[in-house]
């Protein structure tokens, strides 16, 4: 069973997302028309899928691999340099090269950024192997590496040629990673009331990992993101900002833990709860709404407990570095109801007062 949908960005060529019930890498062969292929993956995914992927490629391709360490802390300049050096050392050229990102969000982000900047842009293909990367980071063209002062601070908007994935990847996905991915899925439920109702009615099948339901879940999640990206590919109008619900708080959590604590999706889960509480604090929603929204998150096995190893001062400083901020104004994605999120400006003092009473 294959599900296919199209992403139509504002400024870039359209491309397909292919969601497969089985894992069949041959589906990307039509997109590997270049003669030089560099497969970027990590040590964990390489052991599981690299051999199978390489076996699917045709014989006349010049195929090389670049295997990085696994973890958010390796989404770094050093890892980027390793990819670029591999390309240069093997004389890969702009018009004959395609990069393949075989892995989760870290691999997709860093490979996409390498593709964006190598010789001013080369083709790349996304093969996301985690639920989180399937529904979020592989779609929409955001590519980046982290800086010691903030997450995703060095990056570019750069779209792939195609996204191919399969729910068969879940067979080797740790339960913790699966639940982390569910946080991004649940985020879309707050953007779309229809999807909120669909998730609510299919919760048991999702938690049981029913294959037909999971394909539909991934497809619907990607459709929501694709619709937003089509309106505002490069965050010029503000429409795309709603995709960052939970991320302002979540990114600050990751930064404070040096990217070695909560997984990205876990941090987003906590971040959504923080954004909900902040919305209640500002009078945008009632106490009952805040409880219902947070209960919905938790019902999918997602923890919303704020880490107790983060000091408020450090957390506040991390939030001040958020990319949405401008002219020292803090910007947050806040909720007024299911399907009603908005980008709002708030003062540093307002945030400090909220943090004081919420800890």
Swiss-Prot record:
Pfam families: DHQ_synthase, DHQS_C. NAD(+) binds at residues 70-75, 105-109, 129-130, 142, 151, 169-172. It catalyses: 7-phospho-2-dehydro-3-deoxy-D-arabino-heptonate = 3-dehydroquinate + phosphate. Belongs to the sugar phosphate cyclases superfamily. Dehydroquinate synthase family. Gene3D superfamilies: 3.40.50.1970, Dehydroquinate synthase-like - alpha domain. Its cofactor is Co(2+); Zn(2+); NAD(+). Catalyzes the conversion of 3-deoxy-D-arabino-heptulosonate 7-phosphate (DAHP) to dehydroquinate (DHQ). Its EC number is 4.2.3.4. Keywords: Amino-acid biosynthesis, Aromatic amino acid biosynthesis, Cobalt, Cytoplasm, Lyase, Metal-binding, NAD, Nucleotide-binding, Zinc. It is found in: Cytoplasm. The keyword Phosphoprotein does not apply. GO terms for biological process: amino acid biosynthetic process; aromatic amino acid family biosynthetic process; chorismate biosynthetic process. Zn(2+) binds at residues 184, 247, 264. GO terms for cellular component: cytoplasm. The keyword DNA-binding does not apply. The lineage of its organism: Bacteria, Pseudomonadati, Pseudomonadota, Gammaproteobacteria, Thiotrichales. PANTHER family: 3-DEHYDROQUINATE SYNTHASE, 3-DEHYDROQUINATE SYNTHASE, CHLOROPLASTIC. Pathway: Metabolic intermediate biosynthesis; chorismate biosynthesis; chorismate from D-erythrose 4-phosphate and phosphoenolpyruvate: step 2/7. This is 3-dehydroquinate synthase. One of its GO terms (molecular function) is 3-dehydroquinate synthase activity. Binds 1 divalent metal cation per subunit. Can use either Co(2+) or Zn(2+). It comes from Francisella tularensis subsp. holarctica (strain OSU18). Transmembrane segments: none annotated. CDD domains: DHQS. Disulfide bonds: none annotated. InterPro entries: Dehydroquinate_synthase (IPR050071), DHQ_synth_AroB (IPR016037), DHQ_synth_fam (IPR030963), DHQS/DOIS_N (IPR030960), DHQS_C (IPR056179).
């Amino acid at each position: 069973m294959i599900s296919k949908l199209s992403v139509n960005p504002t400024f870039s060529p359209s491309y397909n997302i292919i969601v497969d019930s089985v894992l069949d890498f041959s589906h990307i062969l039509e997109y590997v028309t270049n003669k030089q292929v560099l497969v970027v993956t990590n040590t964990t995914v390489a052991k599981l899928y690299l051999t199978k992927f390489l076996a699917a490629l045709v014989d006349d391709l010049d195929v090389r691999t670049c295997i990085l360490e696994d973890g958010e802390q390796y989404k770094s300049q050093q890892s980027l340099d390793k990819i670029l050096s591999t390309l240069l050392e093997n004389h890969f050229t702009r018009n004959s090269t395609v990069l393949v990102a075989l892995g989760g969000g870290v691999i997709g982000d860093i490979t996409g950024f390498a593709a964006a900047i190598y010789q001013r842009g080369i083709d790349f293909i996304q093969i996301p192997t985690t639920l989180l990367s399937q529904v979020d980071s592989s779609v929409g063209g955001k590519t980046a590496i982290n800086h010691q002062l903030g997450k995703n601070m060095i990056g570019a908007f750069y779209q792939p040629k195609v996204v191919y994935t399969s729910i068969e990847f879940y067979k080797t996905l740790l339960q913790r990673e699966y639940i982390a991915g569910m946080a991004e899925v649940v985020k879309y439920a707050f953007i779309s009331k229809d999807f909120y109702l669909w998730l609510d009615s299919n919760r048991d099948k999702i938690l049981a990992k029913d294959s037909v339901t999971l394909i539909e879940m991934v497809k619907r999640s990607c459709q929501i993101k694709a619709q937003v990206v089509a309106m505002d590919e490069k965050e010029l109008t503000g429409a795309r900002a709603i995709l960052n619900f939970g991320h302002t708080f979540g990114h600050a959590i990751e930064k404070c833990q040096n990217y070695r604590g909560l997984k990205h999706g876990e941090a987003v889960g906590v971040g959504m709860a923080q954004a909900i509480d902040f919305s209640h604090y500002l009078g945008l929603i009632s106490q009952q709404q805040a409880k219902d929204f947070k209960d919905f998150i938790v019902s999918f096995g997602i923890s919303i407990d704020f880490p107790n190893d983060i000091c408020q001062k450090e957390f506040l400083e991390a939030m001040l570095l958020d990319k949405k901020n401008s002219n020292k104004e803090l910007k947050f994605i806040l909720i007024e109801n299911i399907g009603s999120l908005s980008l709002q400006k708030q003062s540093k003092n307002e945030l400090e007062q909220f943090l004081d009473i919420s800890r």
